[in-house]
């Protein structure tokens, strides 16, 4: 039986396992789906787990279930109250309303983020490593970078674009507060048993602008990266969008690996282009989601082309980081596994 954990760790260290690892987020399996047959064929698990719990000791947080599956979250602070509303979706809750709805809400959210504390749960993480065993790799999931946190958690993507134009000073003041708070998180993660750490992601350069990625996102990668490198740990980012305008920013950053990178036809940068642009980075791709829906021979050819573009395969891994329609999972993953087995190093 293959030791998937060792194979993944070898690839993340820059080596080339005999067979390119294929991982699947363990949280993406639909209800009732049994992954064991695919694991027996050669699929590994990628298990993102935390090494801390977050809490805000001076903020009263109340959640109220609303008709129609809505979940309202109310944050009460000494400087005011904000609310958000989300609704149950396929695998999580989708945001309907975000906490920041007016300029006055910024000071409330600033209080919340400054009050955030991070409680280590190292024994939980060690237990997850033991539980997964050699079936895959447990990596440390953390939080969004400050600017992405503002966009995704506190404002919402569309309104965020307006806020950058109308209230940029308030956005940047909140960014500074979150950045300062994250230094507490850096220490908790750096002192944890995790060896590979994911920080941030879902960056859409067309929305943020490549200059903001360079000026606000990358410095946070680097600050966290410096702290992790002091402890011999590696940092990666979930960069699953169109990366063609930030190739140089990623190259010049302290990121050790890029995770969830998605090649064409879904996104704009090919595996070959990424390997050429980031020779010092490990590349852990997301197999293009649209390709899972294609006929089996097309899936096979797509796999072969990705392997060809990966070159010497050192520091290269495949993964599934997006949900696949349940009826296509076993068929598509089986083809990819079989194809990877046919083209060993």
Outline where the language-model segments fall.
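Segments that shape or occlude catalytic/ligand-binding pockets
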Residues: 20, 27-63
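Short, surface-exposed amphipathic charged segments that create phosphate/polyanion-binding patches used
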Residues: 36-40, 62-64, 156, 298-303
């Amino acid at each position: 039986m293959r030791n998937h954990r060792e194979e993944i760790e070898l690839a993340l260290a820059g080596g080339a396992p005999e067979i390119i690892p294929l991982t699947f987020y363990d949280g993406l399996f639909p209800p009732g789906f049994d992954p064991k047959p695919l694991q027996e064929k050669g699929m590994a698990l990628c298990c993102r787990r935390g090494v801390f719990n977050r809490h805000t000791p001076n903020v009263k947080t109340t959640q109220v279930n609303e008709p129609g599956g809505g979940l309202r979250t109310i944050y009460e602070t000494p400087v005011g109250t904000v609310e958000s509303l989300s609704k149950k979706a396929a695998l999580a809750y989708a945001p309907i309303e975000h906490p920041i709805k007016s300029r006055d809400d910024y000071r409330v959210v600033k209080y919340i983020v400054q009050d955030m504390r991070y409680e280590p749960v190292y024994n939980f993480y060690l237990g997850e490593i033991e539980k997964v065993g050699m079936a895959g790799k447990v990596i440390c999931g953390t939080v969004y970078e400050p600017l992405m946190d503002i966009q995704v958690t506190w404002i919402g993507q569309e309104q965020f674009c307006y806020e950058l134009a109308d209230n940029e000073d308030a956005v940047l003041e909140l960014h500074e507060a979150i950045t300062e708070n994250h230094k507490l998180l850096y220490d908790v993660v750096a002192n944890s048993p995790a060896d590979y750490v994911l920080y941030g992601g879902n960056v859409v350069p067309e929305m943020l602008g490549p200059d903001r990625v360079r000026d606000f996102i990358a410095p946070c990668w680097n600050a966290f990266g410096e702290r992790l490198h002091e402890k011999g740990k590696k940092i990666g980012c979930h960069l699953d969008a169109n990366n063609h305008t930030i190739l140089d920013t990623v190259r010049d950053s302290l990121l050790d690996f890029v995770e969830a990178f998605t090649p064409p036809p879904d996104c704009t940068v090919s595996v070959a282009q990424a390997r050429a642009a980031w020779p010092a980075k490990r590349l852990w791709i997301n197999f293009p989601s649209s390709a899972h829906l294609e006929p089996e021979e097309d899936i096979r050819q797509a796999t072969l082309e990705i392997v060809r573009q990966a070159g010497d395969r050192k520091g290269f891994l495949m993964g599934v980081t997006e949900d696949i329609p349940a009826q296509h999972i076993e068929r598509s993953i089986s083809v990819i596994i079989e194809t990877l087995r046919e083209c060993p190093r």
